Amino acid sequence: MQISVNEFLTPRHIDVQEVSPTRAKITLEPLERGFGHTLGNALRRILLSSMPGCAVVEAEIDGVLHEYSAIEGVQEDVIEILLNLKGLAIKLHGRDEVTLTLAKKGPGVVTAADIQLDHDVEIVNGDHVIANLAANGSLNMKLTVARGRGYEPADARQSDEDESRSIGRLQLDASFSPVRRVAYVVENARVEQRTNLDKLVIDLETNGTLDPEEAIRRAATILQQQLAAFVDLKGDSEPVVVEQEDEIDPILLRPVDDLELTVRSANCLKAENIYYIGDLIQRTEVELLKTPNLGKKSLTEIKDVLASRGLSLGMRLDNWPPASLKKDDKATA
């Protein structure tokens, strides 16, 4: 078989072997030497990091103020319950976020099937265990389920509104990806006299909310869309330049009252026109000690409170104050 130098082989044999409803092996051959690893690695990374899905992002459990708690009559502690909630395989039809409720009394096992669902919400693994209840135990909770992509830690979803949310609303790190495991191997393939070709075998397992075949299609589509820009390297004729302020940590925009300092320390800071945490961290210890009525005890208190938030005195902020922070805001702080 004669092939032009500029001509590349494309897979002519594609086989999909369904190992189980959630697992499949996809075989593609032949591929030019080296393309097995090139395509296999790219698809694997997309499948693991970029597939959209749904996950529990927040839980509110009756009688629980923080995750380091235990519930009377419940075998698992709160951390174990939150970990079990991460194992739920959920599908949302038509909505990006929904709040679900669960209420059950013991004795017995609490499973995903005990969650009260809306008409457009589906839980694939209804037998998934959430907790075990004793005779005197009960579990009541509200779950916020959201749509997302890949993995997203709870800190990444923090906003100004979250600072004022009620105590007891527990944020979860969310793994939205419906793909549980991906592995690939590259084997030798042969076409007539050519023996230096690749055969790509992808072993893919999902959580049941997405068919393995469909997962491969979506990953390939994402890769195709990203590579399309390289086919024609002509961007917009006139690139749009967007002037943007440097991002400022939201905690620096919060008033010093949020630090919950003693009344004496707080009043001393306001007397020096220090209204925001961003104002405070730019002051040095020497400068603060010159403040009337602010002694070493108050200084130590301020340093400890800042340290608990990963901050310290004497920090430099080149873009402070931001343009969005009006001067008259300080007068009302």
Curated annotation (Swiss-Prot):
InterPro entries: DNA-dir_RNA_pol_insert, DNA-dir_RNA_pol_RpoA/D/Rpb3, DNA-dir_RpoA, RBP11-like, RNAP_asu_C, RNApol_insert_sf
Catalytic activity annotation: RNA(n) + a ribonucleoside 5'-triphosphate = RNA(n+1) + diphosphate
Location of the region described as Alpha N-terminal domain (alpha-NTD) in the Swiss-Prot/TrEMBL record: 1-234
Domain of life: Bacteria
GO molecular function, one term: DNA-directed RNA polymerase activity
The keyword Transferase is annotated on this UniProt entry: yes
EC code: 2.7.7.6
Stretches for region Alpha C-terminal domain (alpha-CTD): 248-333
Keywords: DNA-directed RNA polymerase, Nucleotidyltransferase, Transcription, Transferase
Entry keyword annotation includes Hydrolase: no
Cellular component, GO, one term: DNA-directed RNA polymerase complex
Subunit structure: Homodimer. The RNAP catalytic core consists of 2 alpha, 1 beta, 1 beta' and 1 omega subunit. When a sigma factor is associated with the core the holoenzyme is formed, which can initiate transcription.
Domain notes: The N-terminal domain is essential for RNAP assembly and basal transcription, whereas the C-terminal domain is involved in interaction with transcriptional regulators and with upstream promoter elements.
Role of this protein: DNA-dependent RNA polymerase catalyzes the transcription of DNA into RNA using the four ribonucleoside triphosphates as substrates.
Record family assignment: Belongs to the RNA polymerase alpha chain family.
Record protein name field: DNA-directed RNA polymerase subunit alpha
Source species: Ectopseudomonas mendocina (strain ymp) (Pseudomonas mendocina)
Gene: rpoA
